[in-house]
Each structure stands twice: as structure tokens, then as C-alpha cells.
């Protein structure tokens, strides 16, 4: 698939490694308070239910800001925007650790959500600017390891470190990671010419509305965005309730549930480490189809499992299958509209968060009325069909571009 412009000189590896560090901290911030809520509630002398607003407000800020930031990255440069966002996030995350009351913690979490929401979409868009399309899925797959480790840190290590050192120090650790990434990003901006790729100075001037129109007029962009919304809503509308199902159906303790659910990240890391082999062997269509098939197999297993000891293998398979399908979507999102790449990836990322929000809400209603079994079976059917649909869409797209 042709690129819109020649790739600039410079060292892409060092630039992307620092983006991975910033993405690690950004992804960790999404999930870190899940395991810290009881400690925060006790320390601030409020209920866990009241404290949960720090999760809601963060996700609201993190997802909504992505709807409007795209043209800014296209205009001023994605790498520069990530550096500024990481610096702002470092300050806001440190303020989370210093907050003496729940209202101030909510305000700091809201601010950190607005800041970190810039990092991952622009990191993906920057990789789209500097890595040729034929190599992009492999690079994005390896880049994903930073996000996956961040998710694992947020879900598991956050609670462990909170027990050992206190919840405030967990935020200070993440603030230090963001500050370190900021210094590295600024250094790269100063010395590495590749960090200025995709800057608007090399593109014709357009307004914000024109950037969004460019993306939404593209039938391929609309296809990728719709599929990503469905994928996110169905995937997380079911996966969110895996732990609750294990506890209610089999009586699995919460500690074991946490360990079981953590195997999702291990499946993601397996994909990240094997992405080169998978791309070379199966191509995008094979990976998308295989990802959907693995997701279907795993969710059917969870629905029909006779013993909870089967769950870790099924959840690991969900992690592998999800990242196979999702990373193929991400790769195509970076090439939907190269002339407005930042805007395109920001819309794509926002669709993921909106889909996740809708899916979790709908899944909760179904879970309360009918248990998780119909959720898992529906997810299996839809995700299998989605993988096949996307693989067929990729084939048509490549035929049109040939």
C-alpha cells in the first residue's frame, strides 16, 4: 500500500521506545485505581462507592479528549504533542499522590485523564508517519508490549505496591515514569529529525472541520471505525464480567480471580513477541480471521467450562486472539487517511473507549438478568463474524489499492 510521503531520516527505534515508556504509564493510569480503591477510601475516610468516581471521571476525560485532539497533532506534530502531554500528565499524576481530599483527587484524576488521553493515539499516528506500511504491524505489535505491561502493572502491581508502600507512592512511581519519558522525548525532539515527521509544514493548510471531514468521507475509515467500536463493545462487554462469573459460578476467591484475569495480558505479550512470525506467515487477513476464531473458541470455553481451572488458558487465549484482531485494526487505522493521520487515529481511539463504555453498560444488564453465559456465547458469535468481516474488507481494500 503506498505511502503519502517519503519517510524522514533519523532513528525511529529510540523515538518509539520512549513513546512505549509514556504509553506504559498512560495505560497503567487507566486501571491502577481498580485495586487501590479500598486503600484510598480508607485513607480519605469515604466509602468505596464514593471513591469510584475517580475511575469514572478519569475514563470520561481520557476518552472524550480524543474526539477533539486529532487535528492538533496533525498541525503541530504528534511527537511534540506527546512530549507536552507526558509533561502535563507527570504533574497531574503527582498531584494525585498529593491530594488531601476526594474532591482534589477527582480533579487531579480528571486532569491526568485529559493529559494521558493524548499519548497513545499520537504514538500510533507517529509510528504511522515514520514506519512503512509493510513493516508497520510488526512495529506496532512490539510497541504494544509497553501498553500491555502498563495494563498488567495497573491491574496487579498497583495493588501490590499499594499494600507495600501506600497508594500515594503508586502515583508517584507513575509520575516518575512520565517525567523520565518527558525528558527523553524532549531530547529526541532536539536531536532526532524523525520526530518532526508528519508536521503540518509539509502539508497543505486545512481547518479542524476539514480534517474530520477528510476522515469521515473515507468509506474505508468508516469501516475500520465501526468495526473497532463493535469489537470493543462486544469484547469488553463480555470480558469485564469474567471475574464475577468465576466468583459466582465456581466460588473462586478474589485473589485467584485477579491472577486468572491477569493471564489476558500474558496472551497479549505472546502476540507482541510473535507478531513478526505471524505477519510473515499469515498476513493481515489470516491474523484477523485467526484472532476472531481464537476469541470465539475461548468465550465458548468460558461459557461451557465444567471447572474453573480451565479459565486461565481460556483467558490467555482471549488475550492472544484480541490483540491479533485489534492490532490488525490499529495498523489499518494508521493508514485510513494518511493526510490527516492524527485525526484518524484519535477518532479510532475514541471509538474504542465509547464502545467499551457502551458494552460494559449493556453487559451489566444482561449479566444481572441472565448470568454471563449468554454474554460469552454472544461475544463468541459476534467476534468470529467480525474477524471474518474485517479479513474480507482488507482483501477488498488491497484489491482496490493494487
Where are these regions (language model features)?
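Juxtamembrane intracellular "pre-TM" segments in multi-pass secondary transporters
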Residues: 2-10, 190-225
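Conserved MFS/SLC helix-loop-helix module at the cytosolic interface between two early adjacent transmembrane helices
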Residues: 64-100
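Cytoplasmic helix-loop-helix junction between adjacent transmembrane helices
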Residues: 108-149
Amino acid at each position: 500500500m503506498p505511502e503519502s510521503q517519503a519517510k524522514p531520516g533519523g532513528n525511529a527505534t529510540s523515538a518509539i521506545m520512549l513513546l512505549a515508556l509514556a504509553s506504559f504509564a498512560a495505560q497503567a493510569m487507566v486501571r491502577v485505581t481498580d485495586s487501590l480503591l479500598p486503600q484510598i477510601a480508607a485513607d480519605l475516610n469515604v466509602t468505596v462507592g464514593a471513591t469510584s468516581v475517580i475511575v469514572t471521571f478519569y475514563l470520561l476525560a481520557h476518552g472524550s479528549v480524543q474526539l477533539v485532539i486529532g487535528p492538533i497533532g496533525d498541525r503541530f506534530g504528534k511527537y511534540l504533542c506527546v512530549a507536552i502531554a507526558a509533561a502535563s500528565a507527570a504533574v497531574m499524576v503527582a498531584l494525585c499522590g498529593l491530594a488531601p481530599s476526594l474532591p482534589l483527587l477527582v480533579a487531579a484524576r480528571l486532569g491526568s485523564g485529559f493529559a494521558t488521553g493524548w499519548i497513545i493515539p499520537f504514538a500510533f499516528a507517529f509510528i504511522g508517519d515514520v514506519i512503512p506500511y509493510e513493516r508497520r504491524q510488526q512495529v506496532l505489535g512490539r510497541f504494544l508490549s509497553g501498553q500491555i505491561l502498563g495494563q498488567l502493572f495497573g491491574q496487579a502491581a498497583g495493588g501490590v505496591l499499594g499494600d507495600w508502600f501506600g497508594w500515594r507512592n503508586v502515583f508517584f512511581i507513575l509520575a516518575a515514569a512520565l517525567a523520565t519519558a518527558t525528558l527523553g522525548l524532549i531530547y529526541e525532539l532536539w536531536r532526532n529529525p524523525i520526530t518532526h515527521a508528519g508536521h503540518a509544514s509539509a502539508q497543505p493548510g486545512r481547518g479542524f472541520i476539514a480534517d474530520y471531514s477528510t476522515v469521515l468521507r473515507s468509506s474505508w475509515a468508516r469501516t475500520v471505525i465501526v468495526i473497532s467500536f463493535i469489537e470493543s463493545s462486544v469484547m469488553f462487554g463480555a470480558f469485564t464480567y469474567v471475574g464475577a462469573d468465576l466468583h459466582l459460578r465456581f466460588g473462586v476467591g478474589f485473589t485467584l480471580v485477579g491472577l486468572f484475569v491477569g493471564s489476558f495480558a500474558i496472551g497479549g505479550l505472546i502476540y507482541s513477541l510473535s507478531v513478526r512470525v505471524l505477519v510473515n506467515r499469515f498476513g493481515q487477513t489470516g491474523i484477523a480471521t485467526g484472532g476472531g476464531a481464537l476469541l470465539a473458541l475461548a468465550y465458548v470455553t468460558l461459557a461451557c467450562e465444567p471447572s474453573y481451572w480451565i479459565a486461565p488458558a481460556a483467558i490467555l487465549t482471549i488475550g492472544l486472539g484480541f490483540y491479533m484482531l485489534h492490532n490488525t485494526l490499529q495498523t489499518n487505522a494508521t493508514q485510513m487517511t494518511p493526510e490527516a493521520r492524527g485525526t484518524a487515529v484519535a477518532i479510532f481511539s475514541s471509538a474504542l473507549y465509547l464502545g467499551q463504555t457502551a458494552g460494559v453498560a449493556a453487559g451489566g444488564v444482561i449479566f444481572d438478568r441472565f448470568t454471563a453465559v449468554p454474554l460469552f456465547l454472544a461475544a463468541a458469535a459476534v467476534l468470529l463474524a467480525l474477524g471474518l468481516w474485517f479479513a474480507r474488507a482488507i482483501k477488498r481494500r488491497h484489491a482496490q489499492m493494487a
